[in-house]
């Protein structure tokens, strides 16, 4: 299969390209980007000004193409429109953007894609467990106050999509509170969140705290990730899953829970 990893020279895009190459997927030498660059490590970088004129030749040379998007929140919707317009199946690893418009676009087009706020399979499994708990025990945390703090590398522009998803599950269990504190200052990340200095440029530390009204009971859920490799491997799994669905003639929108189920 041919894979176009979009978002180079970004670090996440580089890790995904390496993860896909490791599985012997054909990573083509082109990438959509917002950077004002023409080339990076042998990859030709396409931006809004030239991608429309280049894509036909790319699709002719590299048929059965799947795009993997790790660009920027501001590019999510425009890139998705580009993929749908050119009938390019895609895995959307970029968070942010207008998610309602994104989902409406791909559902109306019945476009084959995987869209998820988190590509780490283990964290997705945790998310699924909390969604199940919320559905089956909707009053489990009635009266509890929820506080959330998340730390990511300083260049992550948006609030964590995973944090938003878990907040919804806790709210569905009766907890109150929807403020997510973003920590992007490196001194605070080290002192407040205990992020190792060597992982300041790539980490995801989340803490969800629930307290009873009289503060006599405290629950805390935490997941800390150092580095980006876990997301690269999960993304490669999503690519393989999507390719399998396409080969079977199945279109539509999938998430990482579907990937986990196979």
Summary of predicted features, one role per range:
Residues 2-58, 142-262:
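C-terminal substrate-binding/catalytic lobe of Rossmann-fold NAD(P)-dependent oxidoreductases
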Residues 21, 84, 107:
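Anion (oxyanion) recognition and catalysis
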Residues 32-33, 95-97, 118-120, 151-153:
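Short, ordered loop/turn segments at secondary-structure junctions
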Residues 56, 60, 77, 81-85, ...:
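Amphipathic, non-transmembrane alpha-helical secondary structure
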Residues 58-78, 88-89:
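Rossmann-like NAD(P)-binding element
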Residues 74-81, 93-115, 121-132:
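Rossmann-fold NAD(P)-binding glycine/threonine-rich loop
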Residues 125-140, 158-159:
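Rossmann-like NAD(P)H-binding beta-loop-alpha module
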